[in-house]
Amino acid sequence: MRPSAAAGGGGGGGGRRKAAAAAAAASREWLVVPASGQARVEEAGKHAVMARTGLPARDLRVLDPLLSYPSTILGRERAIVVNLERVKAVITAAEVLLPNSKDPAFASFVCDLQARVLASSSDQAAEFTDMEGESSAVTSPFPALTSTTPNELEMTNKNSNVVGGMTHSNSMPTLTAAKDGNTKVLPFEFRALEVCLESACRSLEEETSTLEQEAYPALDELTSKISTLNLERVRQIKSRLVAISGRVQKVRDELEHLLDDEMDMAEMYLTEKLTRQEISETSSRVEVDDPSQLEVDRDEDYRSEADVSNGTFIGYKPHIEELEMLLEAYFVQIDGTLNKLSHLREYVDDTEDYINIMLDDKQNQLLQMGVMLSTATVVITAGVAVVGLFGMNIGISLYADPTNEEEKRASNMKFWETTLGTIAGCTVMYIVAMGWGKRSGLLQ
């Protein structure tokens, strides 16, 4: 019995090792960039990331580098999924999760993201300090803390963080008003999204500029000299042009789709949704002493959610001006890149038309030369026919042997007259044929 138990224990150990190996294979490295800007590498599995961001598995598959997905920006309840060219990220209200990569372009993108987050955090901290200094001389609108019970202390701390229309949270950046009251600091998720859009648009713009620098000289050289090497270069350039145009078009279509759908843009306000959730939790704690009022509010919330889910809230228009301006700016940029590619495509098409015209002209010249040679062949054949007639073995006076010098001279004269007459007749026939061809428009 003991050996069998040992064998069973060995089988269980092998199963655990296989499970551990499968779990290790399922996990991957993620580069996490929090609101503080200090990036760190974490190893997490798919289920851990799903629990952390609230994303379904199909959204995480968009970030798989082994799978080919078109450019996509998905707004979910707790995260934004970004798949733009080589930029793949999961953006939450407090951090950005990036699939770790050794690509130099990825390292440059991470540096830009950290710099943007740190700069925005510094500006936000300065504005928060200035606003606290301005509000220190104003009487606080909240009651003084008279009790130190845990519930009241937590509730008072959350309420006291709402000053001057700004909600402060230790776990995420906030949307704060600037000193002039006009400019607003974008929330963390929009700053991260802006870096993603900027990186993707800049990458496509650089590829387009490189293609333009190679394409225009190659096309001009092809128009001046048609050769196999130049044709191969233009063929490769056209293939790259088609590929880049498709990628740029996908990014443009995705931005246009977001701009057309206000509800999708409203879903991307992660910080605002989290702030409303915190305020709702605080209000529920305040109203916990009045169960009847809590029940009424709960019924109203349920009815409002049902109306929104059923589409009966027709007049609802979310507050999306900030995100709309952000997306419009990069939509204009990517549309300009697409226009450059369209102009390059038109230039390629014009070059192809010009080359086809040149080739048609060469073909017409060859056909004209063929007609001229064919006509000359017909005329020469007519002359050969005359020679064949005179070469027949028929007794005529022209072939009679001369008996004296006078007949000999006359015979030679007839020979040259016949020869020159045949040549002149063939020449006249050729000239007449060419004149008729030009007059009828067949020849130039």
Curated annotation (Swiss-Prot):
Gene Ontology cellular component annotations, sorted alphabetically: membrane
Protein's cellular compartments: Membrane
Subunit structure: Interacts with CYCB2-2.
Species: Oryza sativa subsp. japonica (Rice)
Function: Magnesium transporter that may mediate the influx of magnesium.
Residue ranges annotated as motif Required for magnesium transport activity: 391-393
Assigned protein family: Belongs to the CorA metal ion transporter (MIT) (TC 1.A.35.5) family.
Membrane topology classification: Multi-pass membrane protein
PANTHER family: MAGNESIUM TRANSPORTER MRS2-F, RNA SPLICING PROTEIN MRS2, MITOCHONDRIAL
Designated name of the protein: Magnesium transporter MRS2-F
